[in-house]
Curated annotation (Swiss-Prot):
GO terms for cellular component: chloroplast thylakoid membrane; photosystem II. Fe cation binds at residues 215, 269. It catalyses: 2 a plastoquinone + 4 hnu + 2 H2O = 2 a plastoquinol + O2. The D1/D2 heterodimer binds P680, chlorophylls that are the primary electron donor of PSII, and subsequent electron acceptors. It shares a non-heme iron and each subunit binds pheophytin, quinone, additional chlorophylls, carotenoids and lipids. There is also a Cl(-1) ion associated with D1 and D2, which is required for oxygen evolution. The PSII complex binds additional chlorophylls, carotenoids and specific lipids. It is an enzyme of class 1 (oxidoreductase). PSII is composed of 1 copy each of membrane proteins PsbA, PsbB, PsbC, PsbD, PsbE, PsbF, PsbH, PsbI, PsbJ, PsbK, PsbL, PsbM, PsbT, PsbX, PsbY, PsbZ, Psb30/Ycf12, at least 3 peripheral proteins of the oxygen-evolving complex and a large number of cofactors. It forms dimeric complexes. Keywords: Acetylation, Chlorophyll, Chloroplast, Chromophore, Electron transport, Iron, Magnesium, Membrane, Metal-binding, Oxidoreductase, Phosphoprotein, Photosynthesis, Photosystem II, Plastid, Thylakoid, Transmembrane, Transmembrane helix, Transport. 2 of the reaction center chlorophylls (ChlD1 and ChlD2) are entirely coordinated by water. The gene is psbD. Its main location: plastid. This is Photosystem II D2 protein. It is found in: Plastid, Chloroplast thylakoid membrane. Chlorophyll a ChlzD2 binds at residue 118. Pheophytin a binds at residues 130, 143.
Amino acid sequence: MTIAFGRFIKEENDLFDIMDDWLRRDRFVFVGWSGLLLFPCAYFALGGWFTGTTFVTSWYTHGLASSYLEGCNFLTAAVSTPANSLAHSLLLLWGPEAQGDFTRWCQLGGLWTFVALHGAFGLIGFMLRQFELARSVQLRPYNAIAFSAPIAVFVSVFLIYPLGQSGWFFAPSFGVAAIFRFILFFQGFHNWTLNPFHMMGVAGVLGAALLCAIHGATVENTLFEDGDGANTFRAFNPTQAEETYSMVTANRFWSQIFGVAFSNKRWLHFFMLFVPVTGLWMSAIGVVGLALNLRAYDFVSQEIRAAEDPEFETFYTKNILLNEGIRAWMAAQDQPHENLIFPEEVLPRGNAL
């Protein structure tokens, strides 16, 4: 029998292989094929946001000051959404609205669509980066799957919701106080806190925080060696030879506390993955529903009885009145181009007034 020794010589001028070798090379900051999407999009999204919050006014779109140049601070500066009249235009710099004029493009709100679209693709690129690295080091892709949850929330809130409404104008602007205003808008116009998908989202996020705190404390509790002095801070000693974390000890502890406890590390950590990811996905689904103007729970019988009986009021009916007040105030303030005027007699008031 003849055995031939040698190696397969690949075509040295294969551009794909040259690119693949350079992109996936082991270096301090991994680039990868996903980096071709991630790094440019993240750079443009962050650069657009810093540029907008520093220099660009919202006077022409919202009648507001929104930049450091105009006197805003970190909490009040924002990259604001385009004007309502521009509907769902992509607001390309070379498009019919700005016609290549950068100053006009900024005044019309072009930076918002620029940041939103590059931000969305940047987040997707980051998820693909986790897929790519997991495949390279032979890990399962649960990190990327988990990161799909914040991507779903971003896309549903910043893109799908305004697509279901009359324009990008009704999306959140990119700023701290601007996001708070958007939350108030969601409550007043959609009664978001009474939406079951919001409830599932809150349960997921707060439940995940609770699980994270419990898990971290339990691991720290059982990390240092038994019988070596009950000093909490020994858990932070970096010179310990090996990990002494005991799943059995943790299981016995929580069995005594709650009567039940996780007995399997895989199930425990899957549950910690499942709770926040499912909560965020449910929130995203709920926001898609709001884009279509689907309503939350309505307890009409309580509203009718409150209207008929001055002595009957519930927390629900009080919240409905509060929502009416938000709408009456915010519609006129938030959409000055509509010239909305609400006479005193239509403004909401509680039964006590």
